[in-house]
């Protein structure tokens, strides 16, 4: 649970609460700095590794951001960059090298990988105890097997970050209807596992490209989490006002780039000022910073298990 001290809730001119991921992530980083310092005093190394294959501009920027975050909280960083032409064997060798590196507490393989690389094989080769993204099959299985309480494994960063952000702003999910749009492993499927744990206790409606009358599912929701990657998919006339008529909460995970290179989310921006909206995540500046800081938190959690 985040420290609520000295935190001010911001809102727009229509009094919707802006779920500020940047401010929340900064708050968490201050806590992580202290935890990292205690670990170092105990002689326990804290290091995050990254494996990047290719030169995708978005991936390069994201990986650079992760290493910058490490510097801010005192975590050592280990960066392995491979060319786009790297073979399956070369990628697996990099994975096995970090598995055996005592200075690497946890690490991630930046996704997506080039098409000629078997992504499932690469992720499965990660030591589950060093799986900073929480996407190894063993760790996902632990989430499935533990619907009550902490499974004791790294949790997927984006779902964990979303729930942390909502809790930080006092948004109670107990008994609420949450419509999740998108069934990918990194967000859609895995946030369903976290939302339905007994300590969160939400009801999840998981929608996807095969869902009939998506608008109707969205309208019934108290909270909408969209990770479809379809710019402006959700329009204001899709929104309801929540089961308790207290307004709906919008969580925008989608990232699309238009011809002007500006990031667009899954929600039409007119949704942000709709009177039925109680709170929303800006995009950018909402979910993204929370994903990155949860990666750091996973690494620190791993290191603390060595105490």
Which residues does each predicted region cover?
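Glycine-rich phosphate/diphosphate-binding loop of Rossmann-like nucleotide-binding domains
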Residues: 53-67, 151-251, 258-271, 275
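Rossmann-fold NAD(P)-binding glycine/threonine-rich loop
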Residues: 120-131, 140-144, 245-306
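Short beta-strand segments enriched in small/hydrophobic residues
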Residues: 45-54
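Short, well-structured alpha-helical segments in soluble
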Residues: 90-102
């Amino acid at each position: 649970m985040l420290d609520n001290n000295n935190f001010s809730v911001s809102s727009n001119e229509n009094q919707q609460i802006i779920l500020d991921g940047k401010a929340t992530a900064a708050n968490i980083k201050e806590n992580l700095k202290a935890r990292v310092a205690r670990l170092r005093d105990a002689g326990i190394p804290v290091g995050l590794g990254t494996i990047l294959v290719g030169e995708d501009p978005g991936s390069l920027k994201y990986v650079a951001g992760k290493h910058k975050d490490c510097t801010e909280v005192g975590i050592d960083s280990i960066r392995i960059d491979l060319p786009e032409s790297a073979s399956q064997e070369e990628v697996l060798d990099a994975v096995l090298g970090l598995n055996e590196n005592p200075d690497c507490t946890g690490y991630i393989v930046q996704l997506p990988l080039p098409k000629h690389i078997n992504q499932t094989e690469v992720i499965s080769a990660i030591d589950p105890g060093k799986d900073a993204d929480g996407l190894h099959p063993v760790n996902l299985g632990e989430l499935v097997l533990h619907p009550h309480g902490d499974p004791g494994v790294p949790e997927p960063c984006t779902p964990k970050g979303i729930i942390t952000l909502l809790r930080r702003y006092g948004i109670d999910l107990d008994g609420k209807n949450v419509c999740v749009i998108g069934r990918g492993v990194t967000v859609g499927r895995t946030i369903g596992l976290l939302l339905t744990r007994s300590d969160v206790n939400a009801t999840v409606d998981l929608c996807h490209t095969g869902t009939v009358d998506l608008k109707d599912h969205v309208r019934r929701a108290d909270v909408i989490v969209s990770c479809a990657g379809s710019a402006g998919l959700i329009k204001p006339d899709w929104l309801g006002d929540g089961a308790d008529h207290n307004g709906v909460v919008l969580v925008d995970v989608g990232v699309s780039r238009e011809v002007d290179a500006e990031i667009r989310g899954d929600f039409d921006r007119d949704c942000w000022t709709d009177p039925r909206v109680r709170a929303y995540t800006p995009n950018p500046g909402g979910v993204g910073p929370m994903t990155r800081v949860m990666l750091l938190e996973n690494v620190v959690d791993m290191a603390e298990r060595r105490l």
